[in-house]
């Protein structure tokens, strides 16, 4: 095994966990690329990404270009003379000049079993679609969107209770070791590049706030998956009209009950077992929710002082 000189590019916590694994490996991280600091919190103070914070703790050189499309940024990267560049949830497009700069090219860790769920939200879309398993793919990067040749796949189960938050953590445990395994054997032929079958591909579009609103014309099973896929963000919600004011209620947990012959959106019951709402197919039984300005709570706690918010027979929009 040859120790490689690596440029690491990433931004969120998921990426930072990969950088941590690289720092604990026999390879050398010679530079770190991450997104520019962004305003965060109530004071809108500039905040460094988790990757930058970790890099600074280890006194690594940090680069934060707004784009890698200009020649100056590309020359700066090429001058690092890296063996390979590892990209994990970086957030910037890598042009051809950057992809070709390292001696062994660029590797990416993607949160799905490619070619399924190329794109921005593979973890969420796997839950949304009702997939029974997912995983991570370590691949060679090309100019397409997650279309490069695959080197290594690691699988994991999606449980019936899985949320995007829990699946994110599962993959964050699996992926770094898969990456290190590929890097350890990158030049000995252990991992042969496998071309993706484009006919089997689908795209994981980013979740939108509009999509987060529960649509009662969908089946209850789909809405229950949406709730888990949209947890923690952008969080599924419904709206109530309370004395002429619109109240937005975030929904964190629900289960599916057999169908009753009522119009979609009709409130069937509201008791300690849950808020039961008719859908296009089946009943959505909401068990954990969050009124505006409050913390997430069980339906039992919600009913204290709010028992009249969901009245049987009312139809939600």
Swiss-Prot record:
Enzyme nomenclature, EC number: 2.1.2.9
Cellular compartments per GO CC: cytosol
Reactions performed catalytically: L-methionyl-tRNA(fMet) + (6R)-10-formyltetrahydrofolate = N-formyl-L-methionyl-tRNA(fMet) + (6S)-5,6,7,8-tetrahydrofolate + H(+)
Keyword entries, A-Z: Protein biosynthesis, Transferase
Protein name, entry field: Methionyl-tRNA formyltransferase
Pfam families found in the cross-reference section: Formyl_trans_C, Formyl_trans_N
The organism of origin for this protein: Actinobacillus succinogenes (strain ATCC 55618 / DSM 22257 / CCUG 43843 / 130Z)
Residues that bind (6S)-5,6,7,8-tetrahydrofolate: 112-115
Stated role: Attaches a formyl group to the free amino group of methionyl-tRNA(fMet). The formyl group appears to play a dual role in the initiator identity of N-formylmethionyl-tRNA by promoting its recognition by IF2 and preventing the misappropriation of this tRNA by the elongation apparatus.
InterPro entries per record: Fmt (IPR005794), Formyl_trans_C (IPR005793), Formyl_trans_C_sf (IPR037022), Formyl_transf_N (IPR002376), Formyl_transf_N_sf (IPR036477), Formyl_transferase-like_C_sf (IPR011034), GART_AS (IPR001555), Met-tRNA-FMT_C (IPR044135)
Gene: fmt
Family: Belongs to the Fmt family.
Alphabetical list of HAMAP family matching this protein: Formyl_trans
Entry keyword annotation includes Flavoprotein: no
